[in-house]
Regions:
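Short, charged low-complexity linear segments at domain edges
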Residues: 45-65, 274, 314-327, 332
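Radical SAM enzyme [4Fe-4S]-AdoMet core and its adjacent flexible, acidic
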Residues: 3, 170, 175, 180-290, ...
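Flexible mid-to-C-terminal extensions adjoining Fe-S/redox cofactors in radical SAM and related proteins
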Residues: 312-395
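Conserved alpha-helical substructure of the radical SAM core
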Residues: 7-9, 15-22, 27-35, 43-155
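Acidic (Asp/Glu)-rich catalytic clusters
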Residues: 107, 135, 156-160, 199, ...
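Short loop/turn microsegments at loop-to-beta-strand junctions
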Residues: 69, 295-297
Length: 395
């Protein structure tokens, strides 16, 4: 933690907030990857300009703007995952210059962490140029199936500034993973991508895993972590199935609070070993920490330019080709207070009621949903930091 405490201006942060952050960060161990000191991949390296921006703009400056964003670089993907948040999205893809401008605009709004997603983002031929356009004061993380990766492309991404990659791998057995992905060869593509990035030696390598309730409520999740440790990766990035598409709009698919806490405990126990970092999204976004920041601190721009709260929430407030991105984000923030639990888990039944066959749901349906949506009170961090809005219905 000394590396974090040495960050310029960290002493200007309120003591109660610093204590909160130290307790949270104390659940992880810093890992040196290349020249980067990394706590986990949902935060920039603590010795980076991006982390300094987090301290200066978000902690000291208390910026009201977003801190994190994800951009879909393409909707194309050879795999066919049943609960993929992007699979049913339609629309003409934006061009490279529009993506680069969106990155520039997001940084102006306060974004210091940017995730590239898809579809399969590696299928965007300009991905290296797009990565380089973010500069050295914004942390870039890539989410990929591994399809389309070459050693040359991996090296190009590293030179352009990529600091972390999450390769999708959901099961230790090849046949099971391939079946879930609807793509023969998915497992081998993922394993090749993991090895390719590890061979570079300077990119933080994670595996992103979507856990089913069956895996959570058996020994499968813990057994899988043991398998991942054997791959030599730096981090296991865990999430659960989200009710983002009609196939998952049912109670049987949605995690319970008890199951979330079970995964939090699993993460904490593994992190005490100090080997591979386990980073469970529901821990970061739990009410005891930072809560759900969809539409508040998190922004999602899909491959066709639709701007929404997060990758898991199929709603749009407008298209950046039709309205300025900053204007769309400001409106979205007014309607999306930061709450203490996952918005889509709490409100997916409203999507069932208002869905008209289009994904993402259009602006009209989005506003109708928000008239009925439930938002919880601010999570622990925002109660201390003073930026959480009161739990309420959006108007």
């Amino acid at each position: 933690m000394l590396a974090i405490l040495k960050t310029p201006r960290i002493a200007l942060v309120r003591p109660s907030v610093n204590l909160f952050l130290m307790r949270y960060m104390g659940k992880f161990r810093l890992k040196r990857v290349g020249g980067n000191l990394i706590l986990h991949s949902h935060l920039p390296p603590v010795n980076s300009k991006a982390f300094a921006r987090f301290v200066n703009e978000q902690l000291v400056g208390r910026s009201a703007g977003p801190s994190h964003a994800q951009i879909g670089l393409t909707s194309a993907c050879p795999q066919h995952c049943g609960c993929c948040y992007s699979r049913r999205r339609a629309g003409q893809p934006v061009d490279t210059e529009t993506i680069i401008k969106a990155i520039r605009d997001l940084k102006r709004l306060g974004v210091f962490w940017l995730g590239f997603t898809g579809g399969e983002p590696l299928l965007n031929r300009d991905i290296v140029r797009i990565t380089g356009s973010a500069g050295d004061d914004c942390a870039i993380k890539l989410f990929t199936t591994g399809c389309g990766l070459t050693r040359e492309l991996a090296a190009g991404l590293q030179r352009a500034g990529l600091y972390s990659v999450s390769v999708s791998l959901d099961h230790p057995e090849e046949a099971v993973h391939d079946q879930g992905r609807g793509y023969p060869g998915a497992y081998r593509a993922a394993r090749r991508a993991i090895d390719t990035f590890l061979d570079l030696g300077t990119v933080h390598v994670a595996v992103s895993t979507v856990l089913t309730r069956e895996m959570i409520n058996s020994s499968q999740a813990e057994d899988f972590l043991g398998f991942l440790e054997g791959l030599g990766i730096h981090e296991a990035w865990l999430s659960e199935v989200k009710p983002s598409v009609p196939a998952c709009w049912n109670r049987e698919a949605v995690i319970t609070e008890a199951e979330r806490l079970k995964l939090v405990d699993l993460q904490d126990r593994h992190n005490q070993k100090g080997k591979m970092t386990v980073n469970y999204l529901g821990h970061f976004e739990g009410r005891e920490h930072f809560g759900c920041n969809a539409g508040s601190k998190m922004v999602y721009v899909d491959a066709s330019g639709e701007v929404g709260p997060c990758v898991f929430t199929p709603m749009t407030f407008g298209n950046l080709r039709e309205r300025p991105l900053a204007e769309i984000v400001r409106e979205m923030r007014k309607r999306f207070p930061s709450g203490d639990s996952c918005f889509i888990n709490d409100n997916y039944e409203l999507l069932k009621r208002h869905h008209r066959g289009r994904m993402p749901l259009g602006r009209e349906e989005t506003l109708a949903i928000l008239k009925e949506a439930r938002f919880g009170p601010p999570a622990g961090f925002f109660q201390l930091h003073g930026k959480g809005d009161r739990g309420r219905r959006a108007r």
